[in-house]
């Protein structure tokens, strides 16, 4: 297996993980806002996410003479460690599935601020002790405190967004829900309404797959808080991804026939025939898979408490790639910039 031993290699892994893990949520949100059912998107995502883990395991896990290699460990009696790795994958899959719906209700930037901050607070604290305290506590834990403050700022941004949208939409009646297929044939023209106006919000609502008007945003915040997630690194990541794939596959096939949150019913045949946004969904899965793999590798070299901090990039990408409505009001701009400053 390939083992990273240099500081430069560790930094490279961290930077690539930052880029990949910060990009895929924006891509997933893009497909939902274009009307693709989240069940279809997640099924595509989970396939390429697993494929990325397989590629990493059979390449980086085999190319070096260092032992034990990936294939060697597949036949070893290490089931206690395997079960721990698979448990982590299950929690990751449930968390990712929850955040996919939270993005629609709360917004990408707010969701990522809260989920990533909670994940870093819990994960970094646990990993510090599990790593035999190899990281400096006087540096690590002040950063953890900043993430706790970021949760408060994220809630403030959410409150500002909700009040702003409510004032803009006064006088408009509730919108009728439409299916993903209907949105593909809709006559709505992109860019017709000015970003941030009531007309723009209505256009987005008509086109998106998850309808949020008339529903309490407390649902989204509740989903957001729920979302918080002796083998070699490649074998552990492989089993981690296998369990994540299994849970995501089973739950989303169930959601095809028994959808939640008022989504239209679909079928496995409809999923196979739905090529609208499939390429983006595949790309999101690859980015997340390789990002997680690089985070595992960087964590092996620098300590998993330090590697857990790569979650902060999700905030920057969530706010600036998706734009959402944070630029509409100076108050929201100040809140968001404060969050980014605290978490950098």
From Swiss-Prot:
Concerning InterPro entries, the annotation shows: UPS_plant, Ureide_permease
Reply yes or no: does the keyword Metal-binding apply: no
What residue ranges lie in the Extracellular compartment? 1-10, 64-78, 123-136, 230-235, 300-344
Identify its membrane topology class.
Multi-pass membrane protein
Q: Which UniProt keywords apply?
A: ATP-binding, Membrane, Nucleotide-binding, Transmembrane, Transmembrane helix, Transport
Residue ranges annotated as Cytoplasmic topological domain: 32-42, 100-101, 158-208, 257-278
Question: Where is it found, in Gene Ontology cellular component terms?
Answer: membrane
Compartments it resides in: Membrane
Q: Name one Pfam family in it.
A: Ureide_permease
**What's an example of a GO molecular-function annotation for this chain?**
transmembrane transporter activity
Query: Could you say which residues bind ATP here?
Result: 209-216
Q: Which residues cross the membrane?
A: 11-31, 43-63, 79-99, 102-122, 137-157, 209-229, 236-256, 279-299
Question: What function does the entry list?
Answer: Proton-coupled transporter that transports a wide spectrum of oxo derivatives of heterocyclic nitrogen compounds.
Instruction: Say which family it is in.
Output: Belongs to the plant ureide permease (TC 2.A.7.19) family.
Q: Which PANTHER family match?
A: UREIDE PERMEASE 1-RELATED (PTHR31081:SF5), UREIDE PERMEASE 1-RELATED-RELATED (PTHR31081)
How is this protein named in the record?
Ureide permease 3
Gene encoding the protein: UPS3
